[in-house]
Amino acid sequence: MRMTVLASGSKGNSTVIATDNTRLLIDAGLSCRELLKRMATAGEDPAALAAILITHEHQDHIAGIGVLARRLRIPVYFTEPTHRAWVRMLTPRSTITYAQWLDHVQQEKAARAEAAAAASAEPEPPCQPDVESSATNSGAPEPGAPFMTASSSWVGTSATDPIALSAAADPDEEDTPAAPKADPTHLPTVEYFHAGVHFSIGDISITPFTIPHDAADPCGFVFESAADHARMAIATDLGYMPPNVKAALRRIDVLLLESNHDLDMLKDGPYPWSVKQRVLSRVGHLSNAAAAEFLLRDYDGGAHTIVLGHLSEQNNDPSLALLAAEQALAGRMSLLGNRILLAQQSAPLPSICL
């Protein structure tokens, strides 16, 4: 079993969890092109992906899921509230549904094509020898003047009318069906899971657990290989460490743990105070100090490797995050064998294999 962190940070998150038989992508917070590029760099074959799993609907975790899932034709696993929140994010801001909005746009286009076709029809010249008298008596319009359609709608027929020119250039436009707009929320397959309920994909058993974060239904994951029972976990984007998260992270061999910010750097940094309050809240992000406290007081010491992830580029320094974690482990002699790595925003981390 192996973990490959493709990206971790405020600008995008994505991790591969794989065995010899099954390969999963956890979050897709980069563009499809960038995800494919990073998988190639890490030696992971995108065509071998079995599914995408989503922790929550924030942009740095879902930016590329639609394009990637449609391109690879693979299922996406959400909790139902997370899926609904993602759909709402991509649906046009309106009181109507996406289908109703699309139908309205197509009707408008058909109406414009009909008006253009009517505008292109020139009136028949009168069949009278006295043209001036006929025009005066019959009320026929001057050439280029506006006329009334059968439905009493005023339509201009000037030779320079852009609608008329457009219709003349493409007389078959009204017969051409409007091209359907791609639904950005379409996915090949959507599968729902529930926090606390085990499910399996291939030979990987997955246990989602609830995390405290300001999203619809955020979760972390524990992955277990059926072959050798190796266990890996992802626990990022959480404001604090509640008892259920501490319990979920026991007997883990490789742990991706959030260490988002240094408290002093955040407080003195450029973020607006409202954003600082959000990050510091119980549904925000785990600080270096909070991650270190978990390692010192509640961590059972079972991990082969601890990866510190989701480091803020604005409000953290990798050396500070590493120092806090190392000092926490140094306080417990039994934990000195644990290896600590730092996930990066700009490049994949080398695969961690068990």
Residue ranges of predicted features:
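Active-site metal-binding motif and surrounding structural segment of the metallo-beta-lactamase
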Residues: C32-A85, D253
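Metal-dependent catalytic neighborhoods of phosphoester/phosphodiester hydrolases
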Residues: A63-L72, R93, N316-L323
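Short, hinge-like loop/turn segments at secondary-structure boundaries
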Residues: G43-E44, R93-A99, S225, I252, ...
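Cap/insert and terminal regions of metallo-dependent hydrolase folds
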Residues: P242-L342
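Active-site neighborhood of phospho(di)ester-bond hydrolases with catalytic His/Asp-centered motifs
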Residues: I26-G29, L49-E57, F78-E80, A233-T236, ...
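Conserved beta-strand hairpin/beta-sheet module of binuclear metal-dependent hydrolase folds
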Residues: M1-A42, C219-T236, V254
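Short, basic/aromatic-enriched C-terminal tail that caps enzymatic domains
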Residues: N338-L354
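Metallo-beta-lactamase
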Residues: P81-C219, F223-H229
